[in-house]
Swiss-Prot record:
SET domain residues: 803-1266
Domain notes: The pre-SET, SET and post-SET domains are all required for methyltransferase activity. The 347-amino-acid insertion in the SET domain has no effect on the catalytic activity.
Span list, region Disordered: 108-147, 404-545, 868-1160
Listed Acidic residues bias regions: 124-133, 896-907
All residue ranges annotated as the Tudor domain in the record: 257-320, 347-403
Stated name of the protein: Histone-lysine N-methyltransferase SETDB1
Upper classification of the organism: Eukaryota, Metazoa, Chordata, Craniata, Vertebrata
Protein's gene: SETDB1
Bias-annotated ranges (Pro residues): 448-468, 951-963
Compositional bias per record (Basic and acidic residues), positions renumbered to this chain: 1031-1050
Modified residues (Phosphoserine): 112, 117, 1025, 1066
Limits of the Pre-SET domain: 727-800
Organism annotation: Homo sapiens (Human)
Annotated positions binding Zn(2+) 4: 1226, 1279, 1281, 1286
Modified residues (Phosphothreonine): 120
Length: 1291
């Protein structure tokens, strides 16, 4: 205690010192500024008053005070009303009591029903005028007129007292308000008055027989069997006894109580009418859908609604989809809810062309708007708009993806391992993406009662699955130990389900990659800077080079190199003839002078000048590049540069070192910042250009891999690289004339193996660059050729790595490759090298050690399938699915970087309208109001004129009875089907193996049974109708065509049988419900030689019969001499089948049985394969192919190689080059090309990567692994590429 006064004194002294210091400081400020503290405060206050933010805050404060005063006045007003009501009730009670006392009666606070002296009976009239009559069962003759009047007056008073009491209960919010209603009709009949939170007389919603929901009052709860029934009296007359899953609460549930799969009743606006329908919650609110709920209604429509437009179902079923009557809709909902959040949807943006199914036919349509998970489709033929769920199989990319698994299963029968079928290029067209609930806010379906969800949402990412094989060998090995039997590998090509179209050649560009083949002892030629050809010995013969410096500490920067400084002196041109002496002063004196430099910078180091000029053309500023030679000559085109190099005999500069793209900078360097780990060259001199390694995240070193830039044949693999197995040229001009070069001609002639058989004379390298993928491969000059290896324009991949790359550690994808300099479009980057294995050995090794670095050498299969139009899930031609009109128009402008122009995609801009309202939420469908109106009124008449929104195009009129309802007649068009078919036949050539559509790049073949069938999505007809034309003879055909032509401009085939489904295209007929097929059997038809003489007028549309008994999706067989099927324009209208699974497919399935996939392998295909599903087939005499045995069996090309049946595999796990580190991207900047260098064996091409676009320095190099999602059972691999077109999943 003695220390306490000392502490207090110390504090007081400290305070005194501080106050003195403050006073001194204030005095110093006053002396320095020359004003007093009061003046300074006044000056500061004035300055603050002048500030806009202060004035704004004061204004807001004044508004807040005004608002508070207003609210206080409103509260006072409400209190006054409450007091007045209380006084009125008190006065009323006093008046009632006085009146009772005058009558000699005793007043009690009880129900009026208890006071009744006579029992009453309730008579229910079960009609629409459901009125309740109360009939007295006593003797009416014993009453006097006076007593009758008194009783009527007392009943009126009691009713008034009850109304007042109800009002008081509502104001005071008494919890016991329901006790006043126990004396209701349910008590009199001995029924339940309460069932959980359901209480008699409460307001609820009930479902009527018209499938619509209406508000009403719960009047009774009855026990029926093991469950309960609820009697509802609707406000708009009528009563119904309903189950618990057919009534809903009359309040809006909180957002946290709703999850994906919740059963709700939601509002649906159709024009000016509002309906209440039951549905399933498909999306919970998030930023992308503008905080709205996506509802899948029971009848197949989808719509976004707000929380205030939802009502929860009282007693939903455990599996909510079982409450849906439509079987196909129920199947779709079950699949959707159980798979959530993995939702495959088509990635779309405004302006794209896509094929959409309607009434069993594929129509050309355009994307008008994308709103979250919905897309507004405009049908180009009749200008009709419709909102469709982006995951609906009515969209061709989704339909192709769904049918690809069935097609792959049929094609892969008998193999030891089923591999993904990947062969299409990824472009800006529609692709199927797998969305993930990455935010974790959405809740998955819980098969329990809604108030207590038990299943938490699935984590957005697996604990530690590397998204690419570069995620670290240690992590990969630990995962392989856990799942030794389920492994997956990248694919070096692109999926056929994607969309791509070529620009300069008849084949579409693609990303294909094949590994180069060569023995360990085979030497690889490369160019030295002096131009001499050197021979790189085998890895075993190379002496061990000294280890490069390795840094393991934090550095400010990686070792920097001096920047290039352009010379200041000008070059003047004097007229002369360029020759060898023009470059004499810059020819290098020593070997490898500029090795490791940016190849685009090397010409400048030899005194070339690269100048960029500008000029305005059509009000647009354009740029172009000019090279100025050391002798002063200006070179403006690649042709001039090529001529100059040959005239001067320049063997130290090459065509790939020059670039005329003004947006490619030759001196833009990328410098890593503060690396933790740095290696100068991880190849230890094995590559011509050093490959540095940088880790800017941690100190983890790269995996230990034996580096080899050559392919290494494994056990049982023999690659014939002898000169006798090669075709060589004898060119003396550097192979510039493709018509005279034998190697160039191999490349050109191989393009005839494409649909249509068109030869592209410009195929191959164009000035040492490849603008797009060539599906049939590139044949480079080889060691048998007599051309100069340094001057030859047909040698590129064999020269090895030229661009400067760097291995670096990514944030979430392991190790990756990035470029240190800009790379021009079409430039060669690197190859994919590794150990070549047989199929059987790869199966064994993949299951034991992992398959993440496997790549298929399937060049033979890809070209054969491409030639036949074999793939069922490939893109359509340029005027069909997946073409972006905006990209086509702006693709060649040259004034904007194409990779930066991504707008209005369904990922980055789900919702275009910022100021949305509830009116924009509702989707107007073409036949929505019509079908529902018929349900309401019980009529089967056609739609009235005002039952369609005004933006749906011309009004629909009834279909003439002569035309079958639900037929596949196209909407109005300028061309008739006859003209289309005639022009279509005239532009196609006849071949024995099949026929190809030169416009769509598709071809057809018949199945074994000889029946031309078109598979597709399933379709519903509400009334008994067929979806195709069953015409027996030619007269019927012509008559139907004539009627179709006459009525085409007047009708749009929208009748009671046509229903457009927002998310599910395949409901069945209400009468005689049967389960539709779960898969679609895709069959194609091959045209025979006799088709050349077929009559173009004999055209039938392949369609399915809704009443098929033994056949599925086949039209009626014609008689001899007639046709079995025809085609309208295959790019304009395609008919799909909706029957059950094909018998052929079932037979094949049962014969061999599906083989479960255990490993996923990359495919080295690099092109898009035309879709042939859902095709309409040209008519021909099919009598010769009615029996499957009459069709010849075609032998696979690979079987000519000693009967081989499986392709070879490249494994780069333990030994390979830098290609193994290239990561995946759904929007890659590299594509893959098969190149034949040291052998012309079709089984062993080199797999080369080329730039698909200009690439800025520092950008990671990626390509599309193209795994087939779901190809490996039980394995899921998410994608984190970050691209706008990201598909969400790899496996």
């Amino acid at each position: 205690m003695s220390s306490l006064p000392g502490c207090i004194g110390l504090d007081a002294a400290t305070a005194t010192v501080e106050s003195e210091e403050i006073a001194e400081l204030q005095q110093a400020v006053v002396e320095e500024l020359g004003i007093s503290m009061e003046e300074l405060r006044h000056f500061i206050d004035e300055e603050l008053e002048k500030m806009d933010c202060v004035q704004q805050r004061k204004k807001q404060l004044a508004e807040l005070e005004t608002w508070v005063i207003q609210k206080e006045s409103e509260v006072a007003h409400v209190d006054q009303l409450f007091d007045d009501a209380s006084r009125a009730v008190t006065n009323c009670e006093s008046l009632v009591k006085d009146f009772y006392s005058k009558l000699g009666l005793q007043y009690r606070d009880s129900s009026s029903e208890d006071e009744s002296s006579r029992p009453t009976e309730i008579i229910e009239i079960p009609d629409e005028d459901d009125d309740v009559l109360s009939i007295d069962s006593g003797d009416a003759g014993s009453r006097t007129p006076k007593d009758q009047k008194l009783r009527e007056a007392m009943a009126a008073l009691r009713k008034s007292a009850q109304d007042v009491q109800k009002f008081m209960d509502a104001v005071n919010k008494k919890s016991s308000s329901q006790d006043l209603h126990k004396g209701t009709l349910s008590q009199m009949s001995g029924e339940l008055s309460k069932d959980g939170d359901l209480i008699v007389s409460m307001r609820i919603l009930g479902k009527k027989r018209t499938k619509t929901w209406h508000k009403g009052t719960l009047i009774a709860i009855q026990t029926v069997g093991p469950g309960k029934k609820y009697k509802v009296k609707f406000d708009n007359k009528g009563k119904s006894l309903l189950s618990g899953n057919h009534i809903a609460y009359d309040y809006h549930p909180p957002a946290d109580k709703l999850y994906v799969g919740s059963r709700v009743v939601a509002k649906y606006k159709d024009g000016n009418q509002v309906w209440l329908y039951a549905g399933i919650v498909a999306e919970t609110p998030n930023v992308k859908n503008k905080l709205r709920f996506l509802i899948f209604f029971d009848d197949g429509y989808a719509s976004y609604v707000t929380q205030s437009e939802l009502y929860p179902i009282c007693r939903p079923l455990k599996k909510t989809w079982e409450d849906i009557e439509d079987i196909s809709c129920r199947d779709f909902i079950e699949e959707y809810v159980t798979a959530y959040p993995n939702r495959p949807m088509v990635l779309l943006k405004s302006g794209q062309l896509i094929k959409t199914e309607w009434e069993g036919t594929w129509w050309k349509s355009r994307v008008e708007e994308v709103d979250g998970s919905l897309v507004r489709i405009l049908f180009l033929d009749d200008k009709r708009c419709e909102w469709i769920y982006r995951g609906s199989t009515r969209l061709e990319p989704m339909f192709s993806m769904k049918t690809s698994s069935a097609s792959a299963l049929e094609k892969k029968q008998g193999q030891l391992r089923t591999r993904p079928n990947m062969g299409a290029v990824r472009s800006k067209g529609p692709v199927v993406q797998y969305t993930q609930d990455l935010t974790g806010t959405g809740t998955q379906f819980k098969p329990v009662e809604p108030p207590q969800p038990t299943a938490p949402p699935a984590p957005p990412f697996p604990p530690a699955p590397p998204l690419s094989p570069q995620a670290g060998d240690s992590d990969l090995e630990s995962q392989l130990a856990q799942s030794r039997k389920q492994v997956a590998k990248k694919s070096t090509s692109f999926r056929p389900g994607s969309v791509g179209s070529g620009h300069s050649s008849p084949t579409s560009p693609a990303l294909s990659e094949n590994v180069s083949g060569g023995k360990p002892g085979i030497n690889q030629t490369y160019r030295s800077p002096l131009g001499s050809t050197a021979s790189a010995p085998a890895p075993s013969a190379l002496p061990a080079p000294p280890a490069p410096p390795v840094f393991h500490g934090m550095l400010e920067r990686a070792p920097a190199e001096p920047s290039y400084r352009a010379p200041m002196e000008k070059l003047f041109y004097l007229p002369h003839v360029c020759s060898y002496t023009c470059l004499s002063r810059v020819r290098p004196m020593r070997n490898e002078q500029y090795r490791g430099k940016n190849p685009l910078l090397v010409p400048l180091l030899y005194d070339f000048r690269r100048m960029t000029a500008r000029r305005r053309v059509n009000r647009k500023m354009g740029f172009h590049v000019i090279y100025k030679t050391p002798c002063g000559l200006c070179l403006r085109t690649m042709q001039e540069i090529e001529r100059y190099l040959f005239e001067t005999g320049c063997d130290f500069l090459f065509l790939e070192m020059f670039c005329l793209d003004p947006y490619v900078l030759v001196d833009r360097k990328f410098q890593p910042y503060k690396p933790f780990y740095y290696i100068l060259d991880i190849t230890y001199g094995k590559e011509d250009v050093p490959l540095s390694c940088v880790n800017e995240i941690d100190t983890t070193p790269p995996p230990q891999v034996a580096y080899s830039k050559e392919r290494i044949p494994g056990k049982g693999v023999f690659i014939n690289t002898g000169p006798e197995f090669l075709v060589g040229c004898d060119c003396k001009d550097g192979c510039r004339d493709k018509s005279k070069c034998a190697c160039h001609q191999l490349t050109i002639q191989a393009t005839a193996c494409t649909p249509g058989g068109q030869i592209n004379p410009n195929s191959g390298y164009q000035y040492k660059r490849l603008e797009e993928c060539l599906p049939t491969g590139v044949y480079e000059c080889n060691k048998r050729c007599k051309c100069d290896p340094n001057m030859c324009t047909n040698r590129l991949v064999q020269h090895g790595l030229q661009v400067r790359l760097q291995l670096f550690k990514t944030q979430n994808k392991g190790w990756g490759i990035r470029c240190l300099d800009d790379i021009a479009k079409g430039s060669f980057v690197c190859i994919y090298a590794g150990k070549i294995l047989t199929d059987d050995f790869a199966d064994k090794e993949g299951l034991e050690m992992g398959d993440e670095y496997f790549a298929n050498l399937d060049h033979i299969e890809s070209v054969e399938n491409f030639k036949e139009g074999y793939e069922s899930d490939a893109p359509c031609s340029s005027d069909s699915s997946g073409v972006d009109l905006k990209d086509q128009e702006d693709g060649n402008s040259g004034t904007e970087d194409p990779e930066e122009s991504n707008d209005d995609s369904s990922d980055d801009n789900f919702c275009k309208d910022e100021d949305f309202s509830t009116s924009s939420v509702w989707r107007s469908y073409a036949t929505r109001r019509q079908t529902r109106g018929q349900k309401e009124n019980g009529l089967s008449e056609t739609t009235s004129k005002d039952s369609h929104p005004p933006d749906l195009g011309p009004p629909h009129i009834p279909v003439p009875p002569s035309i079958p309802v639900g037929g596949c007649n196209p909407p109005s068009s300028e061309e008739t089907p006859k003209n289309k078919v005639a022009s279509w036949l005239s532009c196609n050539s006849v071949s024995e193996g099949g026929f190809a559509d030169s416009d769509s790049h598709s071809s057809f073949k018949t199945n074994e049974g000889g029946e031309g069938r078109a598979g597709g999505s399933r379709m519903e007809a509400e009334k008994a109708s067929t979806s195709g034309l069953g015409i027996k003879d030619e007269g019927d055909i012509k008559q139907a065509k004539k009627e179709d032509t006459d009525d085409r401009n007047k009708m749009s085939v929208v009748t009671e049988s046509s229903r457009n489904y927002g998310y599910n295209p395949s409901p069945v007929k209400p009468e005689g419900l049967r389960r539709p097929p779960s898969k679609t059997s895709m069959h194609q038809s091959r045209r025979l030689m006799a088709s050349a003489q077929s009559n173009p007028d004999d055209v039938l549309t392949l369609s399915s019969s809704t009443e098929s008994e033994g056949e599925s999706g086949t039209s009626r067989k014609p008689t001899a001499g007639q046709t079995s099927a025809t085609a309208v324009d295959s790019d304009d209208i395609q008919t799909i089948s909706s029957g059950s699974e094909g018998d052929d497919f079932e037979d094949k399935k049962n014969m061999t049985g599906p083989m479960k996939r255990q490993v996923a392998v990359k495919s080295t295909r690099g092109f898009a394969l035309k879709s042939t599903h859902g095709i309409a087939i040209k008519s021909t005499n099919m009598a010769s192919v009615d029996k499957g045995e009459s069709a010849p069996v075609r032998k696979n090309t690979r079987q000519f190689y000693d009967g081989e049946e499986s392709c070879y595999i490249i494994d780069a796990k333990l030994e390979g080059n830098l290609g193994r580190y290239l990561n995946h991207s759904c929007s890659p900047n590299l594509f893959v090309q098969n190149v034949f260098v040291d052998t012309h064996d079709l089984r062993f091409p080199w797999v080369a990567f080329f730039a698909s676009k200009r690439i800025r320095a520092g950008t990671e190099l990626t390509w599309d692994y193209n795994y087939e999602v779901g190809s490996v059972e039980g394995k899921e691999l998410l994608c984190c590429c970050g691209a706008i077109e990201c598909r969400g999943r790899l496996l």
